[in-house]
Amino acid sequence: MQYDVIIIGAGIVGLTLAIGLAKQSLKVVLVDAGKQPKQPKPIKGDKAPVFNARVSAISSASEALLKDLDVWDKIARMQPYTHMHVWDTDGFGEIAFDTHSVPTMGTPKLALGHIIENEVINAALFEQLTHYANADCYFNAKASDLHTNESGASLLIEPNKAEAFHASAKLLVGADGANSKVRSSFGFTHTFWDYDHHGIVANVSTQYAHGNTARQAFTPFGPLAFLPLSDPHQSSIVFSQQSNQAAKLMDLNDAEFEKALQVAINNHYGSVTLNTPRVDFPLRMRYANKWTCKHVAIIGDAAHTIHPLAGQGANLGISDVLTLLDIVAKHKDSLGEVGMLRKYERCRKAEAMKVIATMEGFKRLFDGEQAFKKLIRNVGLLGANKLPGVKAFFIAQAMG
């Protein structure tokens, strides 16, 4: 089967790219080993919704692209956050800002961003993609025998309970995550380091309403974020902790863990109750040294993974999509050729490295209990809250 573009990986980044390319009238096939996304079930009566623990903080730039692709209005539920509060639990530094702090060009900002479950975004994206007759999707499918020649890229697609077939295209895009098969198949080496931290995620109910506020507390062992969900008394938590401390937290029973959250967040929410099981995962940085070769490109987490400190992983991937869509639109006659792909690589590699360096600097500053580090970060937060230029930098990071 002949296509213009083959995409492996149907997460937020892969689905967004597929819609954008289909909108440009290109013939696209999307292949993923996972299940087909489904919209969440409607809430019946007064029953509180059950949220998935994996969420993204979607920036205004990402929102703009999703609106342009007619996806935004299909997202079943989301929570705008209008305030952000960051502080050091063991010091005096803090920074707080809201939509009124954001410089605008005449149009007031209604939100700093939106907290949305990843599976809800994926469901909306897939629903929109099904409107395009020039886009094929295969879920529960295996992709193998990836290779290129002078005319394009090809692979074997093995759908679940269907006959395998070969597909070829001028461009193959790997949107297949941190352990990318596309990246490894074409020998794209990557820089890697382990943060020696684990992220613990869960959804919680709280005694006090979140007030549309995202809060992040820097504890002695790592940051804790409470991200507001569309139920006023529910939040998604991300607790990034040194690996040994994370293991201790995972060993606590639910009541003990809930109390630990309440203390770590300075009792801003009153009592805290777990709604979902805790899930932990190692935090690692990856940065591909090469992103493209003739007829092949990688994108999103396949090209870069960053510390979740500022929740910018999804936005960084969507920015990759925006750049690639723009370059494809201008170079359809040379789709998949080295020149056009290098333009994408040069632009996005530089931006990704800048974000990685910024997040790494924050991570190192807020990790550890040395007296000098504590003084610098507390003075830094205090100064950021007082100085407009520095505060604007923090706001820009929060808004992606």
Sequence positions of predicted segments:
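N-terminal Rossmann-like FAD-binding beta1-loop-alpha1 element of flavoenzymes
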Residues: Y3-L30
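Conserved Rossmann-like nucleotide-cofactor binding loop
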Residues: V13, Q36, N179
